[in-house]
């Protein structure tokens, strides 16, 4: 075996380890001598190595089998080298001739990344006949198979060497060892690791997939799928939608990176009057106008709540990657899989369900329920625990938990987390945490409630039974004591998540308080309670499943079209750079809470890596807009319509700095003119300056052509442009006294075709100032001939056209700028022209 030492690296270690197991030390302590022969024969008694005291090669009838048996074992081992244990919750699928990884993922409602992770593929290429593991659509997770979603998950070893040793150890060498049964594997202590390997973690993505409607500005409303990931937001229209079949997917497929999202707000109705007019009737009727969504659960019996919590299972936001041996089908948020996340507690009483293993509970759901329970208990501190009967109180009536209280509870729990005594202790089996932290008598009592999934045949505690933990350590059972050390880190980690979701809960309390006030005002206006009666309750019951809320995404740059080429998408993005970048989606009401939780979960990290201390500014913050009542709108109209808003700190700072900037704008936007303008007033110059390209700011305006100075000739105009290398501004005054014109990105010249860039735009002061910038539909900016000068084009019409004598002109709407007629009449007579350069 000396030649085996020549192999180095990982493969050498595996080869030497396998050889030592196959041909290691014999029972007498002597090394087994193995001869490799090209043919099989019976050894003679006199052959060396076959003496009485030495081991003989096994005969064909021996239990160990002959050399051919070893060869078959090696072949079998080599076949196993690329295989692994079948993950739970999966089925086998054989790749067909026209299959690709994307088509297979689409067929089984998963993602290509999950298939790569599930099958440990090295590339996305698949071949015909290849067997892949795909999620089983009929798989129902159980206690043994459902993965734990805690930040510190007990995972099986993912090392490739350990996996190779486990799968390739032949039965002939270790006949006493057998694969562990499912019962043994479920009760054996698992190795605690922080996460999966980097290779597996790179493929793990969480996302929301929501069926909604995209409300465009002037191009109708289409249905499709809104895909929200930690990195991007994308909308794909349904091909069966009538508008998509009529206009194509190019108009409606959009996406943008998450870092460009300035704010995301949820409204009960659309505030933009133009969008509201284009809203379909069915969406407008289901928008919930006048119906306040306070998310109350008044009068819900305990049995219904328990059954609802059991149905929820693992359907909540995941916070940590999972092992490849576990089911990945629950990572995806779909309409059919995800039940609404509970936000309000129907009772301040603590109910616990005892189960053998509660690893299937999600950390996000646990933390969220814990925060809500903390909030509910903070108001009812003066009521004893055994007399709390306000089962129908919603969080909007309770109020927000104070910041100081949350900090103090976090500090206490963090200090006691390592000891796992005092404020935190294990109640039942591994990873089951139902705690009640009591501080002082008749003061703030905090209830942590876990609605754990209950299996058939398992005992459960009564709904009124509570387990109270005092600050004195209690003696745990032997089994609990063994789990205590392992769960202490998990408790501290969950407290981090608890504090993280606490800030989210505070914002919800503010939002619900606004809605509560609006409800009370509407009731106070004289609507009798009897008038609502059964009809109102039935209507609300119907609307609960049919209502739409309106998601408004404000982005820094226009969203990119996904069904057009990269060049066209970039061109259209640039054309819409100065427009209002708001995108509206009609989202089902039951998915609004999922969106809120997702934005909070996947916003930039606000915690340190190893501690629960607040160290950085949040990437997204929840704000309440203090809008002043304008002359046209009712006070706090937008605040009443808005459900919630998540925005960036930069966006808030820019809004707060807007008034100060507005005061400085008149001075900063007054350029220096080489000659006084006879066509533009000072306020008109200021308005124009705000829309000029950035490369013109700071340069004085130089008059390079004027009909009063140079005459009315297009050829003279071209001659005065010679040698210029700046944008030029043309201002025209017609015989009706109307002022309009165009900004050209390049000086005017005679050209064979259209020239210019997207900086070109047309404007008019008739009757009010309007600027029409490039729409991105085409690139017909400027066209210069010896007998005419034109701006814009498409469909045979120009936005602005001048003849060779600079006497007659014409203006039409065109696709290049999306403008209307710049003058009062389509045909006009030119009275005066000024052309300004910036140099």
Curated annotation (Swiss-Prot):
Residues 140-161 have a biased composition (Low complexity). The modification Phosphoserine is found at residues 83, 194-195, 197, 287, 327, 329, 339, 488. Coiled coil: none annotated. Residues 357-378, 387-397, 502-519 have a biased composition (Polar residues). GO terms for biological process: adult walking behavior; cellular response to hydroperoxide; negative regulation of cellular response to oxidative stress; negative regulation of neuron apoptotic process; neuron apoptotic process; response to oxidative stress. It comes from the Eukaryota. SUPFAM superfamilies: LysM domain (SSF54106). Residues 543-570 are annotated as: Mediates oxidative antimutator activity. This is Oxidation resistance protein 1. It comes from Rattus norvegicus (Rat). The gene is Oxr1.
């Amino acid at each position: 075996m000396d030649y085996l030492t020549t192999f180095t690296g990982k493969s050498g270690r595996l080869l030497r380890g396998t050889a030592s197991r196959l041909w290691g030390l014999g029972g007498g302590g002597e090394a087994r001598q193995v001869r490799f022969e090209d043919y099989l024969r019976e050894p003679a008694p006199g052959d060396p190595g076959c003496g009485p005291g030495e081991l003989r090669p096994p005969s064909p009838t021996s239990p160990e089998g002959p050399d051919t048996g070893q060869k078959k074992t090696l072949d079998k081992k080599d076949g196993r080298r690329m295989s692994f244990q079948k993950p739970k919750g999966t089925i086998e699928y054989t790749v067909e001739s026209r299959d690709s990884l994307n088509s297979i993922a689409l067929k089984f409602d998963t993602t290509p990344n999950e298939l790569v992770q599930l099958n440990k593929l090295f590339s996305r290429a698949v071949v015909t006949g290849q067997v892949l593991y795909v999620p089983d659509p009929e798989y129902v997770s159980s206690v043994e198979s459902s993965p734990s979603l805690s930040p510190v998950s007990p995972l099986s070893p993912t090392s490739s060497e350990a996996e190779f040793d486990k799968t390739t150890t032949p039965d002939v060498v270790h006949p006493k060892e057998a694969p562990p049964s499912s019962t043994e594997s479920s009760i054996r202590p698992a190795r605690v690791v922080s996460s999966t390997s980097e290779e597996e973690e790179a493929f793990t993505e969480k996302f929301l997939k929501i069926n909604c409607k995209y409300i465009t500005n002037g191009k109708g409303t289409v249905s499709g799928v809104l895909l929200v990931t930690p990195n991007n937001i994308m909308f794909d229209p349904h091909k069966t939608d009538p508008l998509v079949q009529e206009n194509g997917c190019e108009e409606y497929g959009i996406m943008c990176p998450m870092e460009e999202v300035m704010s995301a707000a949820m409204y009960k109705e659309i505030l933009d009057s133009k969008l509201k007019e284009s809203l379909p009737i069915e969406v407008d009727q289901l928008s919930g106008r006048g119906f306040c969504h306070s998310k109350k659960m008044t009068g819900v019996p305990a049995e219904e709540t328990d059954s609802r919590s059991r149905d929820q299972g693992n359907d909540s936001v995941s916070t940590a990657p999972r092992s490849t041996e576990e089911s990945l089908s629950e990572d995806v948020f779909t309409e059919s899989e995800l039940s609404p996340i509970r936000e309000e507690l129907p009772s301040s009483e603590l109910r616990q369900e005892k189960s053998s293993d509660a690893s299937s509970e999600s950390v996000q759901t646990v933390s969220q329920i814990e925060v809500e329970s903390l909030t509910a208990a903070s108001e009812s501190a003066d009521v004893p625990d055994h007399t709390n009967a306000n089962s129908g109180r919603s969080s909007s009536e309770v109020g927000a938990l104070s910041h100081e209280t949350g900090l103090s509870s976090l500090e206490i729990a963090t200090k006691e987390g390592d000891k796992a005594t005092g404020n935190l202790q294990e109640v039942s089996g591994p990873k089951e945490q139902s705690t009640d932290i009591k501080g002082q008598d008749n003061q703030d009592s905090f209830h942590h409630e876990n609605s754990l999934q209950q299996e058939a045949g398992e005992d459960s505690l009564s709904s009124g039974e509570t387990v109270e933990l005092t600050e004195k350590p209690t003696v745990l059972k032997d089994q609990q004591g063994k789990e205590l050390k392992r769960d202490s880190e998990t408790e501290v980690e969950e407290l981090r998540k608890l504090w993280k979701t606490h800030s989210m809960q505070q914002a919800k309390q503010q939002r619900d308080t606004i809605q509560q006030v609006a409800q009370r005002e509407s009731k106070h206006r004289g609507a009798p309670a009897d008038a609502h009666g059964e009809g109102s309750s039935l209507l609300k019951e119907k609307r609960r499943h049919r209502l739409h809320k309106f998601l408004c995404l404000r982005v820094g740059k226009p969203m990119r079209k996904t069904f057009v080429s990269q060049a066209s998408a970039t061109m259209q993005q640039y054309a819409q750079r100065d427009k209002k970048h708001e995108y509206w989606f009609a989202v089902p009401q039951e998915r609004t809470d999922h969106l809120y939780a997702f934005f909070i979960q996947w916003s930039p990290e606000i915690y340190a890596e190893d501690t629960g201390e607040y160290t950085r500014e949040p990437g997204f913050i929840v704000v309440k807009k203090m809008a002043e009542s304008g002359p046209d709108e009712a006070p706090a109209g937008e605040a009443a319509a808005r459900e919630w808003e998540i925005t960036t700190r930069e966006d808030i700072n820019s809004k707060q700095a807007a008034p100060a900037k507005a005061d400085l704008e008149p001075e900063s936007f007054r350029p220096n003119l080489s000659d006084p303008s006879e066509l533009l007033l000072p306020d008109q110059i200021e308005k124009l300056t705000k829309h000029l390209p950035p490369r013109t700011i700071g340069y004085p305006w130089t008059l390079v052509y004027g009909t009063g100075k140079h005459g009315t000739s297009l050829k003279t105009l071209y001659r005065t442009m010679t040698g210029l290398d700046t944008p030029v501004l043309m201002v025209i005054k017609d015989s009706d006294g109307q002022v309009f014109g165009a900004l050209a990105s390049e000086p005017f010249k005679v050209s064979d075709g259209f020239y210019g860039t997207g900086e070109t735009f047309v404007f008019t002061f008739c009757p009010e100032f309007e600027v029409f910038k490039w729409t991105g539909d085409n690139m017909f900016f400027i066209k210069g001939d010896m007998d005419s000068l034109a701006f814009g084009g498409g469909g045979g019409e120009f936005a602005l056209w001048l003849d060779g004598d600079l006497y007659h002109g014409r203006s039409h709407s065109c696709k290049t700028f999306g403008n209307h007629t710049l003058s009062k009449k389509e045909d006009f007579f030119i009275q005066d022209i000024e052309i300004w350069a910036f140099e």
